[in-house]
């Protein structure tokens, strides 16, 4: 599957080019609804360099198609997420992940 994108709220303007620094708010859940991460709960957005492999492949591909101000649901298959290894004892092996991501800005 890779990454499936469902737009929740339309954004405006351009999409971020590969190599840009993007700032997002996100909430990550398992398909059973268990929340495993939330930048809003921490009160701080998350920054990363798009396309540099700093995040899972599903994020690099999904966020690259978003516009500033857009909020989308990214449904990410295990091969575009953490795969057979899972992550940090929180994400089980071969888990499909669901992220609600808001692209705040890029530069």
UniProtKB/Swiss-Prot annotation:
GO molecular function, one term: peptidyl-prolyl cis-trans isomerase activity
Sequence intervals crossing the membrane: none
Pfam families in UniProt: FKBP_C (PF00254)
The organism's place on the tree of life at top rank: Eukaryota
Reaction it catalyzes: [protein]-peptidylproline (omega=180) = [protein]-peptidylproline (omega=0)
Record-linked SUPFAM superfamilies: FKBP-like (SSF54534)
Activity modulation: Inhibited by both FK506 and rapamycin.
The protein's enzyme class: isomerase
Matching InterPro entries: FKBP-type_PPIase, PPIase_dom_sf, PPIase_FKBP_dom
A GO cellular component entry from the record: cytoplasm
Domain PPIase FKBP-type: 19-107
Keyword entries, A-Z: Isomerase, Rotamase
Entry EC no(s): 5.2.1.8
Family note: Belongs to the FKBP-type PPIase family.
Function: PPIases accelerate the folding of proteins by catalyzing the cis-trans isomerization of proline imidic peptide bonds in oligopeptides.
Name of the protein described by the UniProt record: FK506-binding protein 1
The species this protein was found in: Dictyostelium discoideum (Social amoeba)
Lineage: Eukaryota, Amoebozoa, Evosea, Eumycetozoa, Dictyostelia
